[in-house]
């Protein structure tokens, strides 16, 4: 199945060009659609409802096209991420089958706006054979993305979708608008239709248990006239008894009494509290002899320390200071042999000599 005209580098470059081109087109078409919505609001304000409906179909087409471009951009990015598989494998990998077939299918439908997309499709056909490319263009192989085929189809959008667009545009621009009652009556009861029909209306209508992720919750079955009954309340658990910690395990018998009771010890009596406080010595008797009777001492009798020598007690009340000599008011006269020079008062050499003599003697 390996094609002879396949060039890997050319495919890689054009995939990147397709991604950039698609991004620019998406941005451009989104801005144009916003401006077109203002024109539709003007038509509604002027009472030109039919003209507004036709204009809305163009906007829906552009929105579909933008969504299709986003899908193709995603597939191109996927091929670039797995480009090593395209180069190394001769057969088509199953994880790339949808991406490759969708790009080949969309190339002839968008090559007028994205010319690089045709080059990408040709390279893929050269890689996986032209027969494979023919099957992809007609979707006989069945791997083309269904959502992309719906967005690029030539069918007219549903009338209910057109009315939804008109209602939203009138609401955004504060324009009065009365939707078509016939079209609104055809809408499914209880189903909120999106602005862009994604083809999930049948799934929503069918409903049924097990479709939601409610942790085992069963959806209520619809009643008559599309009225959905209120769901039954969830059963509340019965209140449990409060938690109680187990009692600590201990000896079954303790002095004949059960565990947890208290009784005073019969053989031990606390000391009696004296009725009057003990008397203390006065401060005046601090110098007196302090004797404590041996009966007041509890426990073994301590050894008596050596008695210090007694000294006469001083009587501070009769203490008299002795008379001190009077301070002389004249300086003593210098001796006759003393020299008045400060340098002759002390002879350091003589002192050093005497100090050395003392050291020798010792």
Curated annotation (Swiss-Prot):
The modification Phosphotyrosine is found at residue 43. InterPro entries: Ist1 (IPR005061), IST1-like (IPR042277). GO terms for molecular function: MIT domain binding; protein-containing complex binding. Keywords: Cell cycle, Cell division, Cytoplasm, Cytoplasmic vesicle, Cytoskeleton, Nucleus, Phosphoprotein. Residues 333-343 have a biased composition (Low complexity). The modification Phosphoserine is found at residue 4. One of its GO terms (biological process) is midbody abscission. It is found in: Cytoplasmic vesicle; Cytoplasm, Cytoskeleton, Microtubule organizing center, Centrosome; Midbody; Nucleus envelope. Interacts with CHMP1A, CHMP1B, VPS4A and VTA1. Interacts with SPAST, STAMBP, and USP8. May interact with VPS37B. May associate with the ESCRT-I complex. Interacts with MITD1, in competition with VSP4. Interacts with SPART (via MIT domain); leading to the recruitment of SPART to midbodies. Interacts with SPAST. This is IST1 homolog.
